[in-house]
């Protein structure tokens, strides 16, 4: 068990704690995500496929993008298949109501989060959180002053409906008086129905104000004593909505709840109930449910409660929470009640159809009719007064409507259209949210466009086409009609006449009430067909309309039966799912109890096993000691036997190994002998092959030698021929040289003789000059001695200067030519020898034929460098440059140095003059 848990009790607590953490994690994280994903999937399959799942928040650019709404492939099962959407707001409201019906389970789960005892909040999905926020906004405190007649209270209900929130609309005394007057006027025109019909009543609930008509009608002063009369409009269920539906649904119904001020219209207006036009024309075709009950009267005190009701863990509350069985039963009852009414009122309906079609042709306006459709609509002149968007209160089947409930009539109609009031939503939006199970309904007459005669006839034909299209699979887009009403261009004259006619209907006239004005169009052709009269045509048309209406009734009955069957199937599925949920929870509880019992039993068994194990361990230890001693003896004996057997086995293995080694040695020797013989044979074969190759090589070398010898002899012959020619040339050159030397020698001898003769002449001339000079000096001395006192300058010109030419220079001997010196060594003061004009002649062996022969001989008989120079040792630069003196590091030369020397064969021009003497 571990050191932290000393006993089984702590382990149980630890297990409970871990289990609670796991369950909390599942409830607060995993199940929340799964519910949110399920809601988004349901919305995707019930709305359109173009919208992204909003599991994560969008970016602002995605959030503000407006996309065109498209009809989903998956249609609502409660929707009438041939009903067409006449306005965008109607479709939006129907989607909101269907979403409320689908997400009721999520809201009821949200209602169990917070209790009055301050229980811990659970994490919920974003849709449920939005619904909770909207519900809190509904329950926000508002000051109950006479200026604000709208406030929210909680309806006192029984145990089954205690989780629902009820918005209450309060009206003033003047509004109540006007409503009572209107009720009395309506009751004088036609009797009010005393029975409550929840399904059609919910359709007109937003357009009525609460007026008590039972016991309190006789005593209006009692009710006037109260300052405010709070009338319950309907129970408002907080449904989780997506961000689109939230802005249109709960927010509008909660924050913009208003009561339109009732202004009594003129008495002579055609829309007023007691006008003669209404009595004579519209009274026969007014619907029976012109005044509909919407709920019971409640207290005028407003009680503020928490928007989230406390949760109850009992199975009965769980059954009410997770199912819509009671609501679906009420829907089935309403449908059966409507079918019974239709069968009873078919004659009156056919008469009304005739009057309705005749008045439409006569007035070019729509007149309300009652043809047994899914809902009873108020007349066109009735305007919605209450702006709330109620829903049908959930009936659990245990409580029924009391017979003495107060009936609420329609408010006095306002002559202004409903679209002019900004606080009142459209009637299509109100009716779409009244009944969640019946699907979308027809909009009221005030929300429709005025239909012409041609459009009314074309719609009857379109209904037949829509019956055929009902069995086809749904498409992503509703096909547009061939000629929609918004694109019909009416003639100007007819349109102006219609406007004037409507103005005359809406304003009081001075004509007496018994007189009716004729508004029949005068644009028909004057020529009439004599074959059939107008009465016959009208009769045939009405007969066709009657047949079409009967077919429509049959089709609607089929639709109702299919709808009831589908609702029964949904109810059975939901009950089955609820039963499975309850069984699963019971199984979870049973598993918890069984797990606790198993853990306790396990710990008890563990303790018992521990005690038994201790006793058994002691007995086993004693038995083990005895068995160990016996075992040791057996082991020792077995060890000796095994050692003996091992020794014998080892000896046997040794013998086998020796025999095996002998066999291996023998095989190895045989293999070696075989390999030796094979190697010998191979060696002999290789030797023979080598000898053959050697013989071939020698033969080839011999042939090559003969070829070389022949080439050598040929070359020697050529060389001998060249040598002979060179010898002849040499001899001729020697002869020429001897002749030149002889000529030079003769020339030298002649020159020497001439020089000797010149020397003799010069010697004789010098002797003569010396004698003459001596004679002159003697004469001068004698003359000076004779005239010592006389100072006379005497210019004496020597006859030697003009007597003969100047003595020429002696002949220089030619330089001695050393035949062994070729001028290859230069002295330090010699200039570079010119290659084109060498200073010394090139020897004969270094030019011409001797040079070619010497090169050929050296090519074929290369000198042996090893014999000439011996072994050349590698240079050791360290040994060469081992001395180091300071002057070595100084540059003492006056030459031009370029350091470092350039790489390449080209020598720069600056280096060509670097060796010149300066």
UniProtKB/Swiss-Prot annotation:
Region (Interaction with CBX5) residue spans: 124-248
Subunit structure: Component of the chromosomal passenger complex (CPC) composed of at least BIRC5/survivin, CDCA8/borealin, INCENP, AURKB or AURKC; in the complex binds directly to AURKB or AURKC via the IN box, and forms a triple-helix bundle-based subcomplex with BIRC5 and CDCA8 via its N-terminus. The reported homodimerization is questioned as the SAH domain is shown to be monomeric. Interacts with H2AZ1. Interacts with CBX1 and CBX3. Interacts with tubulin beta chain. Interacts with EVI5.
Single GO biological process annotation from the record: mitotic cytokinesis
Compositional bias per record (Polar residues), positions renumbered to this chain: 289-316, 395-413, 421-431
Modifications the protein undergoes after translation, according to the UniProt entry: Phosphorylation by AURKB or AURKC at its C-terminal part is important for AURKB or AURKC activation by INCENP.
GO cellular component terms given for this protein: central element; chromocenter; chromosome passenger complex; chromosome, centromeric region; cytosol; kinetochore; lateral element; meiotic spindle midzone
Region (IN box) residue spans: 826-900
Main location: nucleus
Similarity-based family: Belongs to the INCENP family.
Protein name, entry field: Inner centromere protein
